[in-house]
Structures are given as structure tokens and as C-alpha cells.
């Protein structure tokens, strides 16, 4: 018997694979149902060659075929036609019309093959099967494929010890047409059996169907749910059934995959999102121009606040005092200072990237912000009334060396001229900054009733004296005139003589200003800074300074001489006493 597997693997053009051919194990291949075959008659096997030779010989020898038909008449298979004919779909045959002739093929049961070239019959001992024919009307299809228009009903085939079977035979069996007829199903069995033979029920598309049946049937039978049967419901087109499986399978696969990988995917997506977000934030500070840096300010560093409060005060009063002090700091025009890794950033025009502040920078925690006073002199904010604050300021003024403060007065001594020495009208630049702070403190806190008005004025005058103010030309001229008259060693007398009404001028200020004038007169005019002082006054300063210096030297010499004389007189008196 010819192996069914051999026929399936090495199929030929004149033989068709049975309808219950084995389907592939995997139905997950989503390829097209039909595939064109470039080479039609390549790799022809021995059985295919034998069938071709038999077909040609049977076509040429018509007389021998007629004799074979007569021999078959005695053992013709009984044909039973069912009462209800089932609709059959067209079967593709030869692409051209021709007379139907018996095509010799038989299934060998016992494995012994006797080749009769004329009738192409195989005999296997007592049991054999021969091929007959029946008539069909064939018309060509649009693309050349023949379609069966009038087909006979199902044929009951009985195989026994001496039975012979007739199957349709076509002239020129080995032509280039498509053979979709279902072949006989034979198996090795001791008992007789019968089975229906169904013509192939296939609806052809306008395009050419591949001729090699092996690959085509493999694709059509790709479904795992293939069931063979004789009912009409099972004869639906194979292509639609396969497409249904092709559509339903990805949905099932997707549902199964989502159900399995939900728990795993959620964690992975979350980690990926966080990772991408962090990398994006890191790279954007260097790439994008509109990137932002997120900072969190926990606290500010404020200047020191000196608060003194009696022990009998309440906690609420302490809180109010601290709040007043902080509000005073914020309302006095304080500015914000920035320190990066302990280094103060002074240039406000630098960008954050140039300073080293970026999103991926690890130094964001080392940023320090502080409130700094806008003025150079820090203001002393206390909870004391006005009198106590001024009493604390006064020792500070006395302890400070005003000589250092007034040392540079000669640079801008003539900036603000005035008509008289007693003129108290001063410009905005000459106003004391501490007096502004004192006025603010006085507006916020009321002075106690025990403090007199006179003490307040004295405290204000003491606070005003510690502020350096430039000398006008008139004040310089008055100072020179007083020094020429009284000398350089009598500064208290100079203050009472020339600056009695100027409360903001002390004898120390006058002494420092005189030293500055002497230094300015000794240097060249190119080295002088500020508004120049008239040269006449500078000459008078030099003359007065030289004169009084000489006088002081003479006075000192006289004093030394007196001391020497006294010592000599004492020594002589002592010697006389001895």
C-alpha cells in the first residue's frame, strides 16, 4: 500500500490529498491562505512520473480503454442516490474542456504492485480496486480554472475481496489544471467497509489557486478544531472558517497575556516612569533653556536681635516685641543674601547654571539664604524704650575713635558750602542714618513719662555727633582763622570761639579736620580728591601750622631749659647743704 505520509509530503499534480488530512500542530501562523507556486512541475517523484506515462498511454489507446470498461461492467459498484440531494459547490478541474476518459489509479492494499501500462491497474492479490469513470459537464472559469456545473451525488464505494470501484477519469490527467477532487480513503482492514465520496466543496476566488495540493491543504487545515462529517453544516467554506480562527486567536492571546502580566507590568511601568522622569529632570537643566530648578527653603537666617525685657513681662509681650523687631527688619529694606557651599555669591547677574545650581546638582541642600541689612551700619533693634536705646548707643559712640572716621574729610571738604556757620539746614546726604532709626523707634514705642524733654534732646545730639559730615569752605575758613589766633593746641577754645552754635561739630572733629587740611596742603594738586579747597586757605593753613609748630618747639625748649635749671639749682643747693 502506498504510504499516506509519502503522498502528503511528495504530492503530485494528478493526486489530491484526502479531506481528513492531518492539520499542523500549531495554528498560530498568521499567513495568507493561498500562496502562489513559482515552479509547477519541479521535483517530480516516481509515482507522479508513472501517473503521467499512464495518462498519456490511456489517452492514446482508446480501444484498450473500451475493453477495460467492458470488464468493469460485471463488477460495477452499486450507486445509491439519496432522496434529498445536498447542494454541492463547484470543483476545479482542467482549464480546458475535453472528453472524460478513465484515469487509472488504484490503492494497493497488500503492498504488492503489478503495473499494467495499458490500464494502469494495480493488483494486490485477491483484494484489488480499479478505477471507473462518470460524466461531468465542465466549463472554464474566468481565470481558466474549470468549474463543475453538473455533478453527480455522493457515491457509495464498497471495497471487498473482489470489488472494483469507479472514479471519475479525466482526459489528459496530468495537465496544468487544479485537482480538488477528494480521493478515496482506503485503509488496511480485514473486513469490508464503505464510505462516502464527497466532491471537493470549494469556492474559488478569481485569482489563480496554487496547483500543488500539499502546501495548500496544509494552510487550509491549519485549524485545530477541524471536524470531518457528512452534514451540510460541516461543508462551509474552509477559507471563512480559517479566517474566523485567525480573527479570534489574537483576542484570546491578548486577554491571556494581559491577565498574566498585569501585576508584573504595573511595577515595571512605575519604575520606568520614575526613572525616566529623574533622567529627564537631570538632563534638562543642561540642555533646555527653559528648565526650572526646584528649591525648598526651610528657614532664613536673620541678623541678631538684641531684646531685653523684664522678668515680670508676659510671654505675649515677648512675642509682640519679637514680631515688632522682625517686622522692622523686613520693612527697612533688607536684602536677601545667598551662599553656595559656604561661599557668598555677590554677583546678582550670574545665572544659576554658572553659579553651579542645577536640578541634578547635589549641592542644592547646601544653599543658604540670609536677610542682610541694606545699609552698611547694622541697626540695633531692642525692645527698650527710646531712652534706653540711646543710652546704650552713647557709650558705643564714645568708644569709637572718631579720628578714623574724620580722617578722610579733606577729600570732600568743600562739597556743601553754606552762608553762615550757624546754618542748621543740611542736605539729604548729611542726614544721620541713626536718627532715622531713632525716629522709627520713637514712632513705634512711646517714651516713659519720667524722661524729660531735655534728656531726649541731649541723646539725639549725642547720636548726631557720631556721624561724619563734610566741612564747607566757610567752615574751613573759620577753622583756619581760629587756629591762627589760638594755636593748634587749644581745640576746645577753637570750638567755643568758631563753632559754638554748631552742635554737630566737636573739638575732635575740628582737630581731625585741621590735620586733613595740613596733609592736603602738602601734597600736589593732582593727588587731591574731591572738591578743591582754595589755595589761599591752604597757604594760610601751612603758615599757621609752621608758626604754631615752631612756637610749640620753643615752648618745649623753654620748658626743658627750666627743668634743667631747676635740677641744677637743686643740685647746687644740696651740695651747699653738705
Swiss-Prot record:
Disulfide bonds: none
SUPFAM superfamilies found in the cross-reference section: Homeodomain-like, Ubiquitin-like
Region (Interaction with DNA) location: 465-469, 511-515, 522-529
Gene3D superfamilies in the cross-refs: 1.10.246.220, Phosphatidylinositol 3-kinase Catalytic Subunit, Chain A, domain 1 (3.10.20.90)
Domain Ubiquitin-like: 293-372
Disordered: annotated segments: 440-467
Subcellular location: Nucleus
Annotated keywords: DNA-binding, Nucleus, Transcription, Transcription regulation
Superkingdom of the source species: Eukaryota
GO cellular component assignments: cytoplasm; membrane; nuclear membrane; plasma membrane
Location of the HTH myb-type domain: 463-522
Chain residues forming the annotated DNA-binding region: 491-518
Phenotype of gene-disrupted mutants: No visible phenotype, probably due to redundancy.
Pfam families named in the record: Ubiquitin_TPR1
Any one of the GO BP annotations: ethylene-activated signaling pathway
Domain notes: A N-terminal domain (80-269) is responsible for the interaction with KU70.
Record's function text: Binds specifically to the plant telomeric double-stranded DNA sequences 5'-GGTTTAG-3'. At least 4 repeats of telomeric sequences are required for binding. Induces DNA bending.
Name the record gives this protein: Telomere repeat-binding protein 1
Amino acid at each position: 500500500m502506498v504510504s499516506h505520509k509519502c503522498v502528503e509530503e511528495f504530492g503530485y499534480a494528478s493526486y489530491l490529498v484526502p479531506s481528513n488530512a492531518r492539520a499542523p500542530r500549531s495554528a498560530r501562523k498568521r499567513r495568507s491562505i493561498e500562496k502562489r507556486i513559482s515552479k509547477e512541475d519541479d521535483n517530480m517523484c516516481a509515482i507522479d512520473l508513472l501517473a503521467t506515462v499512464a495518462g498519456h498511454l490511456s489517452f492514446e489507446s482508446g480501444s484498450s480503454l473500451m475493453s477495460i470498461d467492458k470488464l468493469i461492467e460485471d463488477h460495477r459498484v452499486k450507486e445509491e442516490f439519496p432522496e434529498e440531494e445536498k447542494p454541492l459547490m463547484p470543483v476545479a478541474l482542467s482549464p480546458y474542456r475535453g472528453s472524460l476518459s478513465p484515469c487509472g489509479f488504484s490503492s494497493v492494499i497488500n503492498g504488492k504492485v503489478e503495473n499494467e501500462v495499458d490500464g494502469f491497474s494495480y493488483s494486490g492479490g485477491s483484494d484489488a480496486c480499479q478505477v471507473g469513470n462518470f460524466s461531468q459537464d465542465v466549463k472554464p472559469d474566468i481565470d481558466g480554472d474549470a468549474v463543475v456545473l453538473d455533478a453527480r451525488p455522493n457515491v457509495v464505494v464498497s471495497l471487498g475481496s473482489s470489488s472494483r470501484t469507479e472514479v471519475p477519469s479525466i482526459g489528459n490527467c496530468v495537465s496544468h489544471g487544479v485537482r480538488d477532487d477528494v480521493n478515496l480513503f482506503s485503509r488496511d482492514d480485514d473486513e469490508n467497509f464503505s464510505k462516502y465520496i464527497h466532491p471537493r466543496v470549494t469556492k474559488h476566488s478569481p485569482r489563480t489557486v496554487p496547483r500543488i495540493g500539499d502546501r495548500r491543504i496544509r494552510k487550509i487545515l491549519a485549524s485545530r478544531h477541524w471536524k470531518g462529517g457528512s452534514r451540510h453544516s460541516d461543508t462551509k467554506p474552509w477559507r471563512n472558517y480559517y479566517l474566523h480562527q485567525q480573527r479570534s486567536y489574537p483576542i484570546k492571546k491578548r486577554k491571556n497575556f494581559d491577565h498574566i502580566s498585569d501585576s508584573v507590568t504595573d511595577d515595571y511601568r512605575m519604575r520606568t516612569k520614575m526613572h525616566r522622569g529623574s533622567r529627564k529632570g537631570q538632563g534638562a537643566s543642561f540642555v533646555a533653556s527653559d528648565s526650572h530648578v526646584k528649591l525648598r527653603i526651610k528657614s532664613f537666617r536673620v541678623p541678631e536681635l538684641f531684646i531685653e525685657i523684664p522678668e515680670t513681662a508676659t510671654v505675649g509681650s515677648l512675642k509682640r516685641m519679637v514680631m515688632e523687631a522682625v517686622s522692622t527688619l523686613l520693612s527697612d529694606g533688607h536684602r536677601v543674601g545667598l551662599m553656595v557651599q559656604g561661599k557668598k555669591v555677590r554677583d546678582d547677574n550670574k545665572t544659576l547654571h554658572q553659579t553651579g545650581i542645577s536640578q541634578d546638582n547635589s549641592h542644592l541642600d547646601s544653599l543658604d539664604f540670609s536677610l542682610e541689612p541694606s545699609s552698611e551700619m547694622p541697626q540695633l533693634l531692642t525692645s527698650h524704650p527710646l531712652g534706653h536705646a540711646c543710652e546704650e548707643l552713647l557709650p558705643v559712640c564714645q568708644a569709637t575713635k572718631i579720628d578714623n572716621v574724620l580722617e578722610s574729610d579733606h577729600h570732600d571738604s568743600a562739597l556743601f558750602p553754606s552762608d553762615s556757620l550757624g546754618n542748621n539746614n543740611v542736605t539729604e546726604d548729611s542726614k544721620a542714618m541713626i536718627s532715622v532709626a531713632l525716629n522709627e523707634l520713637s514712632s513705634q514705642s512711646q517714651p516713659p513719662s519720667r524722661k524729660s524733654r531735655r534728656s531726649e534732646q541731649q541723646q539725639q545730639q549725642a547720636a548726631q555727633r557720631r556721624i561724619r559730615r563734610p566741612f564747607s569752605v566757610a567752615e574751613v575758613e573759620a577753622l583756619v582763622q581760629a587756629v591762627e589766633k589760638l594755636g593748634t593746641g587749644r581745640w576746645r577754645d577753637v570750638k567755643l570761639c568758631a563753632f559754638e552754635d554748631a552742635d554737630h561739630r566737636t573739638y575732635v572733629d575740628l582737630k581731625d579736620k585741621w590735620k586733613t587740611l595740613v596733609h592736603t596742603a602738602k601734597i600736589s594738586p593732582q593727588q587731591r580728591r574731591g572738591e578743591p579747597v582754595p589755595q589761599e586757605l591752604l597757604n594760610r593753613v601751612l603758615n599757621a601750622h609752621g608758626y604754631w609748630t615752631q612756637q610749640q618747639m620753643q615752648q618745649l625748649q623753654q620748658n626743658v631749659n627750666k627743668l634743667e635749671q631747676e635740677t641744677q639749682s637743686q643740685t647746687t643747693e644740696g651740695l651747699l647743704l653738705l
